[in-house]
C-alpha cells in the first residue's frame, strides 16, 4: 500500500481509521500526564513548596501553549484540508510557513520569560520568599524548552494533518521516557534539586525537536518528498494560518490568564491549597488531555473528509466518536471520584493538603464525562475551519469561571467553592458546545461532493 493510501482518511472503515489516528495522540497525552505526575512525585520528596513552585511556573509555560496551539492548529488544518483536496504542494506551504513562524515566536517568548521572570512571578503575590526564589530558579531553566516545544508541537500537527500520528507518538514517547529517566538522576544523584527537574525537561525537548526535524526531512514516510526548513514567507498562507489559529490561541491565552487569576485566589488559602490544586489538576488531566488529544485527531480526520466533501462520512464519524468518548469519559469520571484519596496520597502526605486535594477531585469528577465528549465537537469545528465557535464558548465560560470562583470562595465553602465554580463552568461550556455542534452539522449537504484526483 502506498504512503498516500495509508494516510488517506477519506476512504476505508471509519472507526478503524479514526481509532488508529487518535490512539497515538491519546497515548501521547496519557504519557505526558504520567510524566507530569512523575515530576510531581519526585518534587514532592523535596517538599510541598517545590510542588507549588513548579505548578506556578508551569502556568507561564501554558501561556506559551496559546501561541503553539495557534500555529499548530493553522498548519494542521491547512495540511489536512489540502491533502483531502489532493493538493500536496499547497499543504506543504502551510507546513513550512507554520513551522518557521512557530520557532521564531517561541524563541522570542523564551527570552521574555527568562528576562522578566521576577516580575512575572510577582503576579501570584507569593508571601514566602523561599517559594519565590525556587520558582525563579525553575523558570529560568524551563523557559529554554519553549522554542523546541513550539517546533515539535507544530511538526506533530503537520504529521497529524497528513494522517500519520504514529511516528510523532514514537518520538514523543522516547522523549518522555528520557525525561522520566533523567529527572531523578538530576534531582538526587547530581543533587540539583528543582533545577535538575528543569534540566531534564530541556534535554527531552531538544531531543524531541531534533528527531522530528529528521522525520520531516529524512523519514521514508514523511508527509512531503522535498521539505525545506527555510523558505520565502507566503503571506497568504500566513494570513490563513492566523485566521484559523488565532481564535484557538486567544481561547487558550485567555483561559491561562484567567486561570492564573484563580490561582492567585488559591494562593490566599496557603501553600497546602496550591500544592493540592496542582496535584489534583495533574490527575484530572487523565480526562482533559485525552479529550484534547482526541480533538486533535478529529481535526485531521474531519479536515481531510471536509476537504474531500465526504458529508455522509462526516456524519458517521460524529456518531462513532461520541460513543467512544462517552465510554472513556464515564470510566475516568468514576475512577477519579472513587479513588481520589489514594491518588492524592501518592503525592502529598499532609492530612490537610490531602483533604483539599480529595475535595478538588470529587467535585471536578462530575464534569469529566462532559469534557470528554466535548472534544468531539471541538475537533469537528476545527477540522472544518470553524475555529471561532469553540473559542467563543470557551472564552465566555472562562470569564464566568472567575466570577463564580471568587463569589463562592468568599462563602463558607472556601476552596471547595473554587472547585465548584470550575466544575460548573466546565459543564456549561461542554453542553453549549454539544448543542451548537448538533445544530451546526444540520447545515451540511446530504450528498457527497466530487473532488478530482
Residues of each region from the PLM?
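Transmembrane helical elements of multi-pass membrane transporters/channels
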Residues: 20-39, 141, 152, 204-208, ...
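Helix-terminus/linker motif at the lipid-water interface of multi-pass membrane proteins
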Residues: 30, 34-52, 121-129, 185-192, ...
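Alpha-helical transmembrane segments of multipass membrane proteins
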Residues: 37-41, 154-158, 177-185, 213, ...
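Short alpha-helical transmembrane segments in multi-pass integral membrane proteins
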Residues: 1-22, 79-145, 189-246, 302-367, ...
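Small-residue-rich hydrophobic transmembrane alpha-helices
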Residues: 51-111, 149-168, 263, 276-340, ...
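Short runs within selected transmembrane alpha-helices of multi-pass transporters and secretion channels
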Residues: 72, 141-160, 168-179, 197-212, ...
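Small-residue hotspots at the loop-to-helix junctions and early N-terminal turns
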Residues: 48-59, 139, 198, 271-286, ...
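N-terminal transmembrane alpha-helices
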Residues: 9-41, 45-46, 62-74, 103-110, ...
Amino acid at each position: 500500500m502506498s504512503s498516500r493510501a495509508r494516510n488517506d482518511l477519506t476512504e476505508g472503515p471509519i472507526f478503524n481509521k479514526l481509532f488508529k489516528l487518535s490512539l497515538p495522540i491519546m497515548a501521547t497525552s496519557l504519557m505526558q500526564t504520567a510524566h507530569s505526575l512523575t515530576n510531581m512525585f519526585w518534587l514532592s520528596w523535596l517538599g510541598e513548596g517545590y510542588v507549588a513552585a513548579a505548578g506556578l511556573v508551569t502556568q507561564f509555560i501554558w501561556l506559551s501553549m496559546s501561541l503553539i496551539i495557534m500555529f499548530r492548529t493553522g498548519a494542521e488544518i491547512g495540511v489536512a484540508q489540502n491533502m483531502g483536496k489532493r493538493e500536496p504542494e499547497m499543504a506543504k506551504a502551510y507546513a513550512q510557513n507554520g513551522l518557521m513562524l512557530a520557532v521564531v515566536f517561541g524563541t522570542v517568548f523564551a527570552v521574555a520569560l527568562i528576562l522578566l521572570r521576577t516580575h512575572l512571578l510577582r503576579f501570584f503575590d507569593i508571601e514566602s520568599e523561599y517559594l519565590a526564589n525556587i520558582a525563579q530558579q525553575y523558570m529560568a531553566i524551563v523557559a529554554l524548552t519553549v522554542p523546541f516545544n513550539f517546533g515539535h508541537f507544530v511538526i506533530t500537527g503537520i504529521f497529524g494533518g497528513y494522517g500519520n500520528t504514529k511516528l510523532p507518538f514514537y518520538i514523543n514517547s522516547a522523549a518522555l521516557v528520557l525525561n522520566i529517566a533523567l529527572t531523578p538522576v538530576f534531582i538526587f544523584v547530581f543533587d540539583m534539586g528543582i533545577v535538575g527537574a528543569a534540566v531534564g525537561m530541556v534535554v527531552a525537548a531538544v531531543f524531541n525537536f531534533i528527531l522530528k526535524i529528521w522525520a520531516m526531512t529524512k523519514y521514508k514516510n514523511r508527509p512531503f518528498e522535498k521539505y525545506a526548513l527555510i523558505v520565502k514567507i507566503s503571506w497568504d498562507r500566513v494570513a490563513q494560518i492566523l485566521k484559523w489559529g488565532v481564535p484557538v490561541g486567544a481561547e487558550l491565552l485567555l483561559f491561562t490568564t484567567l486561570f492564573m487569576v484563580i490561582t492567585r485566589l488559591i494562593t490566599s488559602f496557603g501553600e497546602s491549597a496550591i500544592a493540592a490544586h496542582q496535584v489534583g489538576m495533574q490527575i484530572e488531566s487523565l480526562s482533559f488531555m485525552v479529550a484534547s488529544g482526541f480533538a486533535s485527531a478529529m481535526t485531521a480526520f474531519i479536515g481531510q473528509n471536509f476537504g474531500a466533501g465526504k458529508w455522509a462520512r462526516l456524519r458517521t464519524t460524529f456518531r462513532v466518536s461520541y460513543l467512544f468518548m462517552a465510554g472513556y469519559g464515564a470510566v475516568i469520571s468514576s475512577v477519579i471520584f472513587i479513588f481520589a484519596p489514594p491518588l492524592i496520597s501518592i503525592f502529598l502526605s499532609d492530612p490537610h493538603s490531602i483533604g483539599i486535594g480529595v475535595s478538588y477531585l470529587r467535585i471536578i469528577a462530575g464534569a469529566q464525562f462532559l469534557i470528554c465528549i466535548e472534544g468531539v465537537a471541538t475537533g469537528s469545528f476545527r477540522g472544518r475551519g470553524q475555529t471561532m465557535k469553540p473559542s467563543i464558548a470557551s472564552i465566555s465560560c472562562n470569564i464566568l469561571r472567575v466570577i463564580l470562583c471568587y463569589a463562592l470562595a468568599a462563602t463558607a465553602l472556601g476552596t471547595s467553592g473554587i472547585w465548584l465554580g470550575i466544575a460548573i463552568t466546565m459543564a456549561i461550556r461542554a453542553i453549549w458546545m454539544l448543542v451548537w455542534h448538533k445544530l451546526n452539522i444540520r447545515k451540511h449537504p446530504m450528498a457527497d461532493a466530487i473532488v478530482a484526483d
